[in-house]
Amino acid sequence: MNWLEERLPGIGKVAEDIAEHPVPSHTLNIFYCLGGLTLLAFLVQCVTGLFLALYYKPTPEAAFASVQMITNEVRFGATIRSLHHWAANLMILLVFLHMLRVYYTGSFKKPRELNWLAGCFLLVLSLGLAFTGYLLPYEQLSYWASVIGAETAGSLPVVGATMKIMMQGGIKVTAEMLSRFYVLHVMILPLVTIGFLVAHFIMIRVQGISDPM
């Protein structure tokens, strides 16, 4: 730390402020840890997703075979894929529980409305990550689930038809849909999610944790 302090004056104070920042006593229970646990699940997915991306091939001909290879041939591949899968399921559950806690305790009220909106966007992004990731194994279950998702989007008024074509890359499910979902899942949605997470935590730090009801 002294080496860093000599080259980046003030970094020690920043680290100390982060590590020793006091929190209200009423937050010392599991219900106030749901947001942090959600972040942990997201980080697990980021790390395991990087390893999975090393072997996954986003083409209709090779996607399923590459997933099978990861599961059956790559060392610890089945473990990494299972961690990614269960962390994804757990993250969705934790996001809903976290938002229920925030709503029940009234933590979304003034002056924290913007942070509540950021949390709502994070919920949508989490569902988007789950949906786009579901297609990637490109098996029968994931294929038809994606077809249903595209048809559901297509039923929306005004913008539905355009959304459906954008999702599918045409009038029906094609290889374009797999490549688009892959880019969304591994690049666009994670980066947007990280941006909203940074904003979310900055607002928590500035405004503090809300008082109990």
From Swiss-Prot:
Positions that bind heme b 1: H98, H200
Positions of transmembrane segments: 30-50, 88-108, 114-134, 184-204
Primary residence: membrane
Details of cofactor binding: Binds 2 heme b groups non-covalently with two histidine residues as axial ligands.
GO molecular function, one term: electron transporter, transferring electrons within cytochrome b6/f complex of photosystem II activity
GO cellular component, one term: plasma membrane
Keyword annotations: Cell membrane, Electron transport, Heme, Iron, Membrane, Metal-binding, Photosynthesis, Transmembrane, Transmembrane helix, Transport
Protein residues bound to heme c: C33
Cofactor: heme b; heme c
Subcellular location(s) per record: Cell membrane
Keyword Heme part of the UniProt annotation: yes
InterPro entries registered for this protein in UniProt: Cyt_b/b6_N (IPR005797), Cyt_B6_PetB (IPR023530), Cytb/b6-like_sf (IPR027387), Cytochrome_b_N_euk/bac (IPR048259), Di-haem_cyt_TM (IPR016174)
Bilayer disposition of the protein: Multi-pass membrane protein
GO biological process terms held by the UniProt record: photosynthesis; respiratory electron transport chain
Oligomer and partners: The subunits of the cytochrome bc complex are a Rieske Fe-S protein (PetC), cytochrome b6 (PetB), subunit IV (PetD), and a diheme cytochrome c (PetX).
Name of this chain's protein: Cytochrome b6
Native source species: Heliobacterium mobile
